[in-house]
């Protein structure tokens, strides 16, 4: 009720005063979703309530299938080093995470973007900088013919008096989060009823344990798992040898969206979305925050720091 009676009306009311932002903050124009809320087997991402897919160059007439083999990580502008050279991107199965800070000594005010300037790797799909998150999910569902999402997107566009092109913007990104919240909330009673019926039917399984026992594993194995976190596409890749983890890489939503430039000079979604943003007061660049906030950024999610001895790394005290 809150989403329908408060969130969406407030979203539309505020957005109506910022319709110029329907032409600002577009970003890279490439969008991906791994799919979420599977309709049958949890491993079947081709049959999801929120469909999987890839939209290239804002082309809503064609939704491409997602192929995990096309995901790579680039460190040309990130503070890491690859054993085979920093100019070649690696697939997560072959991924390396070797910290190599070459930036200025803190504290500093500026970073040279022609060099390495971030701890975030340059994540790419088929060599392309790609946005993930609510906007990507809603665009792919809309372009895939999802009935309810097409209805709600159409309603929002009509009430704001803008066309589908407005979706590729800061305003569109913000609206997509509200649209997704509404349609997902509408489905909750359905899913809860399904869960209730399943439990009453005696099915209490919470996971697939067919390959849970390490003794059943081959000498060498590889696997990956996809999930749509609220912020976007989340992927885990693992390589197992002799029953032990030989390599593991986690490619997270914050990494996709906050990616730096790659070896080819392609900007990541954050950077690309800020191009041509009008700034009223350079001393108070609220417009920059407006676009970055539309991605719901989380740098603590993009980069994880873990001590191998499980010692405390840093303590932050908020007073």
Each model region followed by its residue ranges:
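Active-site bordering "gate/hinge" segments
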Residues: 1-231, 242, 247, 252-319
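C-terminal, well-structured subdomains that either form a transmembrane helix-short loop-helix hairpin
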Residues: 234-239
